[in-house]
Amino acid sequence: MLFRSAPDWRDQLETAAKAGGASFYVSGIFPGFASDQLALLMTTQSKNIRCITASEVALNDHYPVADVMMDGMGFGRPLDFEPMLKTPGFIELAWKAPIYLMASGLGVEVEEVRGTLDRQLTDRDIKVAFGTIAAGTCGAVRTRAAGVVNGGEAIVIEHVIRMARDVAPDWPTSDCDATYRVDIEGDPDIHCVMTLGEAAGHGAGHAAMMSTAMRVVNAIPYVVDAAPGLLSSLDIPTTLPRHVFDGALTQILDPT
């Protein structure tokens, strides 16, 4: 995500976009809609806020890329292995964009971003899309990035990923393959839960990929209408889809 990116290359992109009359917008689901815009939408009900937490709890046994899952995140590795996630500053860098975006939308300044990483072992072998996670290696990962406002952790992004539902039972859980939550401590307290995929809670992997793509596809006409430059969801209207019922109507009229 580009929000509040390093000014040296952000300024270059901004200048190039304006010179060429182009607009550039990025989004997704998490990071993306569920990690920032959904939370901001929920705050329209708030009188005051102590803390906003946007979180994802996901079963990622379907993800097939071993390099990302093992070397990047540490799954299937012993706890003394240092994945990319453990690189100092990586979690803060990875999640600061939605934190700064929410802060900007609410008109507050982030003093710093604090990142933490936790991992838990599996006590059994787990068959997953990229191979086998052996007993005694990492079977669940939890990251947390907290934006500090007025000295307190006020805007928090949490991410819990498991390779099986029974790993790390003391962490936040979900009956669905992927659950996105927004929890706002304030007046009033607000809690919003969003799931993707079938109603039974399965198929979230495919649904998340579709949602990620459609966040961008549905934004196209709004980005075209926007002024040249680098855009965030704060710069364009809610990206309501167009012609969204056309395909469904065609199938109803001609199911063959």
State each model region's role.
Residues S5-A6, I29-S35, L59:
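Gly/Ser/Thr-rich loops at beta-strand to alpha-helix junctions
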Residues D8, G32-F33, G89-A97, A140, ...:
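Conserved active-site and cofactor/substrate-binding residues in soluble primary-metabolism enzymes
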Residues R10-I29, I52-T53:
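Rossmann-fold dehydrogenase core element
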Residues G21-S27, K86, A199-A207:
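A short glycine/serine-rich beta->alpha loop
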Residues F33-Q45:
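Alpha-helical support elements that line or immediately flank enzyme active sites
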Residues T43-D170, S174, A178-V182, H206:
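Active-site-lining helix/loop region of Rossmann-like oxidoreductase modules
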Residues A129-T256:
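C-terminal active-site/capping subdomain that shapes the small-molecule cofactor and substrate pocket
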